[in-house]
Amino acid sequence: MTKAPEGRRMLRVEARNSQTPIESKPRWIRTAVKTGPEYQDMKKKVSGASLHTVCQEAGCPNIHECWESREATFLIGGANCSRRCDFCQINSAKPEPLDRDEPRRVAESVREMQLNYSTITGVTRDDLEDEGAWLYAEVVRKIHELNPHTGVENLTPDFSGKPDLLQEVFEARPEVFAHNLETVPRIFKRIRPAFRYERSLDVIRQARDFGLVTKSNLILGMGETVDEIRDALVDLHSAGCDIITITQYLRPGPMYHPIDRWVKPEEFIDHADFARELGFGAVMSGPLVRSSYRAGKLYAEALAARGESLPENLAHLATTADGSTAQEANTLLEKYGPSQDTPVVSSKA
């Protein structure tokens, strides 16, 4: 029997989801652990200073590759989210009091880890008057202050689409402003009931109008069709999105949205080709790609597509922008060969 989340009753949608057993993964969803000197050095720094990253705590399968490039992701705003998305394992409950010292600690962690590029993400804070806008902006400011050679990507909620709150975040000038659309209009309300499809597009539009490099993500396998994915890509590009990541939904546990289908690497390649034809500046597409995966590489590619050079203080990111990556669909296809349709079945079957 599935237990209710700590601190609240199980929702009806969670009880319904729990009736579907956890699915067995296809053969192409696997990672080969390869460690290098940069990863080992990062690991020592993190354990020695008791630092915390999403990479470790979420058990990200890409930690070895990203850490080898000295990239890491931090979660801010506490452990509880004021909203609930049906794919996300972050606990939905009353958020903790705002920790105004968190920006300093995150910036010091970035310095201790000697990161080339950092991604900041976090929970929604609808309980706060500014919905957490100050926090997201201040973390960027503090990282830039203490780490002038570290790129910062700010992956934020929508701040209810309020221009004044978004403006505060924009003015901190992260290298990349990211807001994830995640899915298509037909199933959006079912998957992200507290968000709105058009509002998320408008957040991207406002960031691009401000002059920032923009980024978003689509998760496949939650019930969308191929045509709907293409339409969402068109919508994102029309809104001014520079960078797009496309990934397979992996169910965090029984209470979450059941997997509708396993998307083959060949389809991920098709979507990537379509996105490039539309004019996205940087594209990363594959089953185990995540929105912060190789983020520094994508930032460098997006600037190049704009005809811009990396800032002098971030010129070292050019060394991470060459060649393919382990989780891109074309790399998987080269490694495992042509894929076969894989039905969604219980791991207990």
From Swiss-Prot:
It comes from the Bacteria. This is Lipoyl synthase. It is found in: Cytoplasm. Pfam families: LIAS_N (PF16881), Radical_SAM (PF04055). The keyword 4Fe-4S applies. NCBIfam families: PRK05481.1, PRK12928.1. [4Fe-4S] cluster 2 binds at residues 81, 85, 88. CDD domains: Radical_SAM. GO terms for cellular component: cytoplasm.
